[in-house]
Amino acid sequence: MQAIPIKTIGDPSLCDLVDRFQRQYTYLRLSITEVCNFRCNYCLPDGYRPPSHKQRFLNLVEIKRLARTFANLGTEKIRITGGEPTLRKDFLEIVETISQTEGIHKIALTTNGYRMERDIHLWQQVGITDLNISVDSLDPRQFQLITGENKLQSILKGIDRAFELGYKKIKVNAVLMKQYTAAELDKFLAWIKHKPIQMRFIELMETGEMDNFFKTQHLSGQTVMQRLLAEGWRLQPKAVNDGPAKVLAHPDYQGEIGLIMPYEKNFCASCNRLRVSATGKLHLCLFGEEGLDLRDLLLSDEQQPQLAARLKSALQTKREHHYLHIGNSGIRNNLASIGG
């Protein structure tokens, strides 16, 4: 009888997903839909446009098989993304299914917060452990200008409700833009002074459909970092499983600032995540190839060994870093199809 090793939470030596550069992948970003109800000017300014051919997004059974296989290979955290994942009618069932997967210890959700005020208690009940909410402005008119939706107050109430329900820290994402976010830095700092929010400023990335927007709105995260350092904020040491964000803290603030700067040297050195699209394609990099189809190996439980072998084999082709610094964003026209 073959002995089955007991996995210890957080032990990277037990991860089977390792690339040629000895990076270990314990984190899966799983998109469950490409549909989004916001029209953010930096992502989908014209709104979601369905493709001419009919698409089928991963169903509940396929997601269950996928999560189980990744967990068996050492994945401990799954982030559910979109589009806007909470638009799926079976969203709660999906979360509950993943939460019942042995080996998965964290289930994070990236959402625009559209349904948060109403549904956060349900999300918590089915197993959402971590939250990332997109809030690109704290000014209602500016927020509507950026997103196409007048939902800021509801989203902010949803965040407060999450704290009331016991969430200890919430990550809030804002895309760093010259005309918008940068001008509101003082507002964001005041907001997090007495709230345990990690306010993450994500540097605008150049994608195929948004070249002109990038040229007019891109602002280096270093600009923000230098200001914060001058005001007494201090860079925090990174833990082994931390992502690419550079986190700053200040003794007078309950919240933190996170800066995600993909154009920085060595940005990819700490990569620990793989992505699967809503249509079942494995993406080794946010700015990479067309993706490797996995759906033919999600038809039955008996295919798990073949699926695991395909994942491990594909990982050996992962590049050491992206090529954004030379203007190559791969095939990515926008980030809505894979959730960033």
Swiss-Prot record:
CDD domains: Radical_SAM (cd01335), Twitch_MoaA (cd21117). It comes from the Bacteria. Keywords: 4Fe-4S, GTP-binding, Iron, Iron-sulfur, Lyase, Metal-binding, Molybdenum cofactor biosynthesis, Nucleotide-binding, S-adenosyl-L-methionine. GTP binds at residues 29, 79, 110, 171, 273-275. S-adenosyl-L-methionine binds at residues 42, 83, 134, 205. Its EC number is 4.1.99.22. [4Fe-4S] cluster 1 binds at residues 36, 40, 43. Pfam families: Fer4_12, Mob_synth_C, Radical_SAM. Binds 2 [4Fe-4S] clusters. Binds 1 [4Fe-4S] cluster coordinated with 3 cysteines and an exchangeable S-adenosyl-L-methionine and 1 [4Fe-4S] cluster coordinated with 3 cysteines and the GTP-derived substrate. GO terms for molecular function: 4 iron, 4 sulfur cluster binding; cyclic pyranopterin monophosphate synthase activity; GTP 3',8'-cyclase activity; GTP binding; metal ion binding; S-adenosyl-L-methionine binding. PANTHER family: GTP 3',8-CYCLASE (PTHR22960:SF28), MOLYBDOPTERIN COFACTOR SYNTHESIS PROTEIN A (PTHR22960). Belongs to the radical SAM superfamily. MoaA family. This is GTP 3',8-cyclase. It comes from Haemophilus ducreyi (strain 35000HP / ATCC 700724). The gene is moaA.
